[in-house]
């Protein structure tokens, strides 16, 4: 089973292996230092035929060297300080991680006899010898194979690469502390062929298609009237906003309605009180008695002599011919003339009487045909007698 690993994953695996080696070397260094101070029954390391390291007990006493060279001591101190700095800066656990590193068929396992620097150089050489992402190789059949790795959501045919090199990543972004996950590729955007509709997005297939052609039955249908549906939804939203505004206004008038109800109850109580007081009162209406008619009253009246005393013209009060007056010498004179009135004052009195009778008719009859006829007859009247006659007829029609 063949598989490929990206450059970033290889570098992260190398870094993890280096940290494990550092931890192992640190432990071995601590063991060797402690062996110098322990009794003679101390363990010693021996090389096996198979290239592995074996631990054996040596009963013979081993004496530590009295002194070491200055260069060797400085070299050990620098190694220990560098390891401590790496341990303090690294966010990965210092404990060795157990597991199997999956490599390609042509990858060699690191030899435990090599040093730390040698392991780093070997890893760099393997990374340089591996084919790049954009490199094409020829297989045994003579066809070209593209070594670029296809990720989820990506497109092999696109020219835009979804990754950057490690140097560019270190310049633009901080170093990652974990394995980077695959990023989502949103695809290429194209303008829809139907301006009045919309094409639904199809779900991405997990399998790599063999060709760019697709079956007609698998392609989702486009919406021909998407814009009209949106217009209808917007119209419904506008109507809903208007209805909400009207409901808010109605809710504001709720307090006014309650206040009106309270006022109505108070008015009903006051009206009931007034009705009770009216029943205790006796109202006398100075009108025509119901049992005696006006004609019977006129028959009962008789002519009697009337004496008007004082100076002045009696013609203003008496309009009959058979009147006796006294002249300037106090002599009785039979007056054969009719009532005389001042023409200037007569016109003013007639106009005032017309206005009074017209208002009375409007109050009694309102705006009806009978009221209009009476008003027309009042306007056509020229004397006070005519106006008084119209007034009398109007009052009789009511009773």
Curated annotation (Swiss-Prot):
Region: Disordered, residue numbers: 30-112
Keyword field contains Signal: no
The keyword Protein biosynthesis is assigned to this record: no
Residue ranges, compositional bias (Polar residues): 30-46, 82-112
InterPro entries hit by this protein: P/V_Pprotein_paramyxoviral (IPR004897)
Region of interest (Multimerization), ranges: 224-287
Keyword terms of this UniProt record: Coiled coil, Phosphoprotein, Viral RNA replication
Pfam families: Paramyx_P_V_C
Origin: domain of life: Viruses
Coiled-coil stretches noted in the UniProt entry, renumbered to this chain: 226-253
Purpose: Essential cofactor of the RNA polymerase L that plays a central role in the transcription and replication by forming the polymerase complex with RNA polymerase L and recruiting L to the genomic N-RNA template for RNA synthesis. Also plays a central role in the encapsidation of nascent RNA chains by forming the encapsidation complex with the nucleocapsid protein N (N-P complex). Acts as a chaperone for newly synthesized free N protein, so-called N0, allowing encapsidation of nascent RNA chains during replication.
Family membership: Belongs to the rubulavirus/avulavirus P protein family.
UniProt comment concerning the protein's domains: The N-terminus consists of a long intrinsically disordered tail. The central part contains the coiled-coil multimerization domain (PMD). Forms a four-stranded coiled coil structure. The C-terminus constitutes the alpha-helical domain that binds to the nucleocapsid (N-RNA complex).
Self-association state and partner proteins as the record states: Homotetramer. Interacts (via multimerization domain) with polymerase L; this interaction forms the polymerase L-P complex. Interacts (via N-terminus) with N0 (via Ncore); this interaction allows P to chaperon N0 to avoid N polymerization before encapsidation. Interacts (via C-terminus) with N-RNA template; this interaction positions the polymerase on the template for both transcription and replication.
Full protein name: Phosphoprotein
